């Protein structure tokens, strides 16, 4: 039997997870390359700033470890209060992420869940 679990923050609001799953265009991302290491460090700096947004609790960035053409490259996982999502959407960090890296993204999946 599958259980539906709702996680509440300390204040009682229902928390959600916001996933950004990204596949970069060809020749943009090579996991072990120096350019990709620098790019990842910059992406981490951008998303670290989102932790300053009230209601954003955690941000984790995961790299794909299976270099196959049908795989995505990064998954950014944010845990936040549902009310924080529109604040994040309007934040300078989110706008910087889109401005700096949007042109390099081949496909992106956004998935929100409780």
Identify the function of each model-found stretch.
Residues 2-72, 83-86, 114:
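Short S/T/G/P-rich N-terminal loop/turn motif that feeds into the first structured element of a domain
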Residues 41-45, 49-51, 79-111:
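An amphipathic, aromatic/His-enriched active-site/gating alpha helix that lines ligand/cofactor pockets
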């Amino acid at each position: 039997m599958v259980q539906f679990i709702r996680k509440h923050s300390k204040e009682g609001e229902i928390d959600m997870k916001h996933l950004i799953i990204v596949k970069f265009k060809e020749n943009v991302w090579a996991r072990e390359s120096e350019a990709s290491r620098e790019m990842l460090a910059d992406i981490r700096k951008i998303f670290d700033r989102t932790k300053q947004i009230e209601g954003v609790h955690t941000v984790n960035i995961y790299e794909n470890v299976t270099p196959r053409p049908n795989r995505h490259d990064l998954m950014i996982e944010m845990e936040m209060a549902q009310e924080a999502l529109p604040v994040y959407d309007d934040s300078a960090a989110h706008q910087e992420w889109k401005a700096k890296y949007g042109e390099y993204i081949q496909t992106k999946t956004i998935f929100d869940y409780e």
